Structure formats: structure tokens, C-alpha cells
Swiss-Prot record:
The gene is alr. It comes from Polaromonas naphthalenivorans (strain CJ2). Its cofactor is pyridoxal 5'-phosphate. PANTHER family: ALANINE RACEMASE (PTHR30511), ALANINE RACEMASE, CATABOLIC-RELATED (PTHR30511:SF0). Signal peptide: none annotated. This is Alanine racemase. Pfam families: Ala_racemase_C, Ala_racemase_N.
């Protein structure tokens, strides 16, 4: 019998979340962001649920090949562009759109011999300070690209660093508009947080939106808002079962380092899930879990293959009882948002999704 841990991908939730994006940005086309193997969900698994998107955005050519192998004939955007000159030929063959964010990429394109001109997104650095041309250098980059016979169409893009917080998007929008107001081409401005939080300010200004984490049911501005506040549904459940039981007396300790000390008599359950499965090792005592749909807590340190949970709130739990590490319990409708587990671990839901280990079996419902 296989180990009882399981990741379950909820396709109906993916479709629901995509529809939620369209409600928030009704006039925009949608790039469904499927980088990092669709945030750990698997490109092949999520494709049917997201195929009503107008395009897919991702990072590397292998992911693009996989989409084309699924018979996707629509737009695909390489969010970081091409890393080597030889990638440009494959972009042509696969019909990919790609980002231009530095002078070296323009140089590669200028030296490229092709019969199929490229569609590119020229990226402005409006304050994120990762990729893109500064506002002062953006127009010169656009002029040079526009003169290249290798370029068919130039669209414009930028990325908001603070759309999820109090700083907002005003400064970035002003910087972008000041430089691009008279330039032709479609715009893509909005990430997940901007789509949900700045609907009014961006209405009619972003021809394409780029939802990422919202498609996968996590709130981009947690804990200010939860996923349910935004009417998002969780798309991944990580579940397991109790494989061992212990009864503790006051003063007994649990796990490596004896970091948890029982204050009184209690029962604990040993769960088949550990950091080798992608569960964060730095989750502390108190991290929420569900046992048979009832909320309780993890106690002690996370081991490679096991965690231990407090069964005090679930006196009927025993061997084989279901444990929901995040997502939906199988019965009763109980939910444990991935964002709550991530906050306990000092990280974000994105990381937990992407970190689920290959040894964890995956089911699709």
C-alpha cells in the first residue's frame, strides 16, 4: 500500500478563479500565468481548466513546448524573454511572444535572421528594479526595436511592486504613462493584486492582465484579505492520514530537540507528511491542520517524513484519520487556507504550492 499522502488538484476551482479574474477585469484579455509548472499544479493537469484564457504566460521554452504539445495554438508569452540567441529561432517555430527587458536582448534580436518577425513585449522598470528599461531609457529602446525588420509588433508592459499594499500603484502608473502615452501597442500592466485591488484605476488601461496566484486560489494581499474575501477557491489540497498514535503525560516531549512539552495528559497523532514532501520544516508548534475536518494544531518539529498533531479537539480521531495540511477536507466542507499555513511558516502560499515534492502522488478532481 502506498504512503497515504496526496496532493489533489481541483479543476473546477481553477475555472472558477479564472472567471473571477474576468469579472474583475471584464475588458481585458487574460494571460493565465503557468510558470513554475503552473505554480506546482502541473501544466498538463491545469490546461483544460484554463484553456479559455486568451493566452498563457510562462518562463522557459520547455514549458512552451509542453503547451504546444497539448495543441494550444493561441498566444504564449515568455515573461523573461530569451536567454540566448539560439532561443529566438525556437520562438519563431513555436510562435511565441517574448519580453524584451534589456539592451542585450535587443542586440540578439537585431542579429537574428528570420523569415517570421517577432511579437515582443517591451518592459519598463517602474520601480520593481528587477527587469526592464528605466523610464529614461525606455523610448530609445522602443525606437530601436521599432526599426528592426525582425519585429512585427511591440506591446508594452510593466510590473507593480506594491499593488498588494498601502503604497499602491499611482507612482508606477504615472511613470509608465509619462513615457508611453503616445506610443502604439497593447499594454499589460496588472498582476494578481492589481487586478483585484485596483479595478477602478486600471479600467480600460490594461489590454492584457496577468493573473498568477489568484488563479490558484491564494490571496495576493493576505492577511489583509483572505482568498474567500476575494471569492477565490483553493485549487490544491495536501492531505494525509494518521499512521501512529501516542498518549502523553505532563512533561513528555515530542520530536527532535524535545521542542514541545506537554502541559498535561494528551493524545497526539503521527502524520505521514514531512519536509521531504514539501511541508515547510520551519512550521512551528501551533501551525493549523485539520483532522477529520476539525481544526487543531501541529506540535513539535517537522521531520523529514512525519509531523505530529494535537488530537485534543478530535477525541475520536485514530489510525487512518484524514489530515488536511491545506485545502479542503474530504467531508463536511471544512477548509484550511494555504495562506494560513504559509503565514505560520513565515512564507507565502506561492512557495508552498511550488514546493510540493515529486514523491507526493497527485490526483485530479
Amino acid at each position: 500500500m502506498p504512503r497515504p499522502i496526496l496532493a489533489t488538484i481541483h479543476l473546477a476551482a481553477l475555472s472558477h478563479n479564472l472567471a473571477r479574474v474576468r469579472t474583475a477585469a471584464p475588458d481585458a484579455k487574460v494571460w493565465a500565468v503557468v510558470k513554475a509548472n503552473a505554480y506546482g499544479h502541473g501544466i498538463e493537469r491545469v490546461f483544460d481548466a484554463l484553456r479559455s484564457a486568451d493566452g498563457f504566460a510562462l518562463l522557459d521554452l520547455d514549458e512552451a513546448r509542453r503547451l504546444r504539445a497539448l495543441d494550444w495554438r493561441g498566444p504564449i508569452l515568455l515573461l523573461e524573454g530569451c536567454f540566448e540567441a539560439r532561443d529566438l529561432e525556437l520562438c519563431s517555430r513555436l510562435g511565441l511572444w517574448h519580453t524584451i527587458h534589456c539592451q542585450e536582448q535587443i542586440d540578439m534580436l537585431a542579429a537574428h535572421k528570420t523569415q517570421l518577425p517577432h511579437r515582443v513585449f517591451l518592459k519598463m522598470n517602474t520601480g520593481m528594479n528587477r527587469l526592464g528599461f528605466t523610464p529614461e531609457r525606455f523610448r530609445a529602446a522602443w525606437i530601436r526595436l521599432n526599426a528592426l525588420p525582425q519585429v512585427d509588433e511591440i506591446s508594452l508592459m510593466q510590473h507593480f511592486p506594491d499593488a498588494d499594499g498601502p503604497k499602491g500603484i499611482t507612482a508606477q502608473l504615472q511613470a509608465f504613462d509619462a513615457v508611453t502615452h503616445d506610443l502604439p501597442g497593447e499594454r499589460t500592466l496588472s498582476n494578481s493584486a492589481a487586478i483585484l485591488r485596483h479595478t477602478g484605476a486600471l479600467a480600460g488601461r490594461s489590454d492584457w492582465v496577468r493573473p498568477g496566484i489568484v488563479l490558484y486560489g491564494s490571496a495576493p494581499d493576505f492577511p489583509e484579505h483572505s482568498a474567500s474575501d476575494w471569492e477565490l477557491q483553493p485549487t490544491m489540497t495536501l492531505s494525509s492520514r494518521i499512521i501512529g498514535l501516542q498518549t502523553l503525560a505532563a512533561g513528555d516531549t515530542v520530536g527532535y530537540g524535545s521542542s514541545f512539552v506537554a502541559e498535561g495528559p494528551m493524545r497526539i497523532g503521527v502524520v505521514a507528511c514531512g519536509y521531504a514532501d514539501g511541508y515547510p520544516r520551519h512550521c512551528p508548534t501551533g501551525t493549523p491542520v485539520l483532522v477529520n475536518g476539525v481544526r487543531t494544531r501541529m506540535v513539535g518539529r517537522v521531520s523529514m517524513d512525519m509531523i505530529t498533531v494535537d488530537l485534543t479537539p478530535v477525541p475520536r480521531a485514530g489510525m487512518g484519520s484524514e489530515v488536511t495540511l491545506w485545502g479542503r477536507a474530504s467531508k463536511g466542507g471544512a477548509m484550511l487556507p494555504i495562506d494560513e499555513v504559509a503565514r505560520a511558516a513565515g512564507t507565502v502560499g506561492y512557495e508552498l504550492m511550488c514546493a510540493v515534492a515529486p514523491r507526493v502522488p497527485v490526483a485530479v478532481d
